[in-house]
């Protein structure tokens, strides 16, 4: 170790997608090295290829352990798993070798984080079809990380420009999401989200719970989920000492959070929170996975096979994910 900055592990994602390109571009940014010590987990051949795509010239320092890193701008510190035949890799295509390799990068990152070599990980895009082709039986990052860390139910938070958004429901139909708005579930998530914020070092302010219906139901005129589930859950949480308010109409709650009235918003369904964050700033919307023994941030875009290999992919989101991991990791450890 040369300094006391947090060490952030960055698995390079699906080697046939834009992941290698956006991490290479990210490591040309001085701000990244000002905030942390980044280490890539991937394949040197893939990284060299990505540098060619992006017209970037950086040195590669292959290491076995984190403390061997140089952590200087102009040099990539790399845990080289050497697991890709570059002649067989087809950029921009679904293929098993890429899915299998991407899984191995994640697995190695988690192992290093568990051993204390990494303070956090910032992940890059993987592809569900490539995972399946590679006989990796997971549907995505969160499921992989949950299994590798023995976490039953990870909690996703989005952060963009200081606004934090949690999700009561995620990948279910809107009809199903409405059915899942129960007093018990809302109360459970208020507690879990509050605990997640505390673990991230966010102790000031209060959480807002978004309304489900127009005008939060208007006392039952436009739906009764607020009266039957949301309000009772909030009142019970308040009695338990949690700082939470609501329901606040979804047309205004995110604006109020952005202005600083609330430290976070509990969104009641997937698109309610996604629309708010991504409209505010699509590229800087970063996912933070809570509830695990390790801290993970992630870009919120896919492998972009259509532009992979062209050097066009923006690294803005990747830089943001790395810096956010560096921001929260010292507090997360406490």
Curated annotation (Swiss-Prot):
Its EC number is 1.1.1.408. The keyword Oxidoreductase applies. One of its GO terms (molecular function) is metal ion binding. InterPro entries: PdxA_fam. It comes from the Bacteria. Its cofactor is a divalent metal cation. It holds the Pfam family PdxA. The keyword Oxidoreductase applies. Binds 1 divalent metal cation per subunit. Keywords: Carbohydrate metabolism, Metal-binding, NAD, Oxidoreductase. A divalent metal cation binds at residues 171, 215, 270. Substrate binds at residues 141-142, 278, 296. NCBIfam families: pdxA (TIGR00557), PRK03743.1 (NF002992). Catalyzes the NAD-dependent oxidation and subsequent decarboxylation of D-threonate 4-phosphate to produce dihydroxyacetone phosphate (DHAP). Homodimer. Belongs to the PdxA family. PdxA2 subfamily. This is Putative D-threonate 4-phosphate dehydrogenase. It comes from Clostridium botulinum (strain Hall / ATCC 3502 / NCTC 13319 / Type A).
């Amino acid at each position: 170790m040369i300094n006391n900055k947090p060490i952030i592990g960055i698995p390079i994602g699906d080697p046939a997608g834009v992941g290698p390109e956006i991490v290479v571009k990210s490591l040309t940014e001085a701000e990244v090295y000002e905030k942390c010590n980044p280490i890539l987990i991937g394949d040197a051949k893939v990284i060299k290829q990505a540098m060619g795509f992006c017209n970037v010239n950086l040195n590669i320092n292959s290491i076995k352990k984190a403390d061997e890193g140089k952590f200087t701008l102009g040099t990539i510190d790399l845990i080289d798993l050497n697991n890709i035949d570059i002649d067989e890799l087809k950029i921009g295509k679904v293929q098993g070798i890429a899915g299998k390799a991407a899984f191995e990068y994640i697995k190695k990152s988690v192992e290093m984080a568990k051993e204390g070599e990494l303070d956090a990980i910032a992940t890059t895009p993987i592809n569900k079809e490539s995972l399946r082709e590679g006989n990796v039986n997971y549907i995505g990052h969160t499921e992989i990380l949950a299994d590798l860390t023995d976490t039953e139910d990870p909690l996703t938070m989005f952060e963009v420009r200081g606004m934090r958004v949690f999700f009561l429901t995620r990948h279910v139909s809107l009809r199903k999401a409405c059915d899942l708005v129960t007093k018990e579930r809302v109360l459970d998530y208020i507690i879990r989200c509050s605990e997640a914020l505390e673990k991230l070092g966010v102790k000031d302010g209060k959480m807002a719970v978004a309304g489900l219906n127009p005008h939060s139901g208007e006392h039952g005129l436009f739906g009764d989920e607020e009266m039957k589930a949301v309000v009772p859950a909030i009142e019970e949480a308040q009695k338990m000492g949690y700082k939470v308010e609501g329901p606040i109409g979804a047309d205004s709650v995110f604006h109020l959070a952005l202005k600083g009235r609330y430290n976070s918003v509990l969104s009641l369904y997937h698109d309610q929170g996604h629309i708010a964050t991504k409209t505010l700033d699509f590229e800087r919307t970063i996912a933070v996975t809570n509830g695990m023994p390790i801290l993970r941030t992630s870009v919120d875009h896919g492998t972009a096979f259509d532009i992979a290999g062209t050097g066009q992919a923006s690294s803005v989101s990747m830089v943001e994910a790395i810096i956010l991991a560096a921001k929260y990791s010292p507090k997360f450890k406490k």
